[in-house]
Amino acid sequence: MKERILTSLIAAFVITSLQAQTTPAVPRLVVGLTIDQLRSDYIEAFSALYGERGFKRLMREGRVYCNAEYDFINIDRSSAVASIYTGTTPYYNGVVGNRWMDRASLRIIKSVDDPAYMGVYTSESTSPQHLLVSTLSDELMVATCGNAEVYSIAPTREMAVLAAGHAAKGAFWLNDETGKWSGSTYYGSFPEWVTTYNDRDGLDFRIGNLVWGPYLPVTSYKYVTSDAKQLTFKHDFSDERTEKYKKFKTSPYANDEVNKLVDACLTYTNVGKDNVPDLLTLSYYAGNYAHMSNAEYAMEIQDMYVRLDNSIGDLLDLIDRKVGLNNTCLLYTSPSPRD
């Protein structure tokens, strides 16, 4: 049974300032944005709440592929991201899910576990060893004789590593216990610019002051059921001890945190600064807060999409300032919309 991706498999977006002839044949930067839990029906249902810089710009100036499918079942973050960036199904790429039973040891293993490598800013040992084929980033590194700059940034470990592939220069994700951007020794030395970000502006310094409330007036949110707990909402993370970063990663602020590290990446690396094409693989989150039901958190999911729209707009503006959208190709897609 095939499962349809409820958003487009690839929505390709190339800004050309309305003059196609000014677009270089090879972009300086390719950005792959995978939005976890994104639903095309929600994109459409909440469209009246959006500004002009995010979804509407992508739809207006990009190309949308609507009739796309995953050619396998039991889709989750790992199997979907592996398939997106390898162009193959789990039968070939080896990643059948977030976790599975290892036949040799009869133990449950996670998709990016690898005891051969140490974690940086994390105790988790990680590599893409279970990916059995090359990825887009691997092929780009081969094609450029290793001269491309390839980085992956995501809230979750599996999305960061599987999108990065084998040959990227770094894959970074938010630590569930500390909020620091983490990595693996598999990718070599940990970049100084990420260490500096962690030490000076890490999430752990700011999370106590973050409060998530409605971005728009509550009367703007029309889809509120009788099961909704209240007519407004307010979530903060200051009282959480063990779960605050996990809950943070299911809030729209996780997408802003990705953008902040992208800003540092574009500032302190050579990404997009020469004619050798570079690749950034990014991940956002668009699911329910703390994985609760839509009925209970109907207002939050609408606000999630409003803030997601803003985050996409901020990302496009950031890339335009640092690299130039006329030098950039951006594609966005989503795994199947479920946890």
Residue ranges and their predicted role:
Residues 43-92, 149-153:
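Short, structured active-site-proximal loop/turn typified by the sulfatase FGly-forming signature C/S-X-P-X-R
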Residues 1-25:
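Bacterial Sec-dependent N-terminal signal peptides
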Residues 26-30, 62-65, 146-149, 275-278, ...:
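Loop/turn elements at helix/coil->beta-strand transitions in domains of secreted/extracellular proteins
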Residues 24-43:
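Mature N-terminal segment immediately following signal peptide/propeptide cleavage
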Residues 168, 278-280, 290-318:
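Extended hydrophobic/aromatic segments used for targeting, binding, or gating
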Residues 89, 97-276, 285-292:
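His/Asp/Glu-rich, glycine-adjacent segments
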Residues 332-339:
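Conserved small/polar residues in nucleotide/adenosyl-binding loops
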Residues 39-45, 70, 122-127, 247-250, ...:
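Second-shell loop/turn segments in exported
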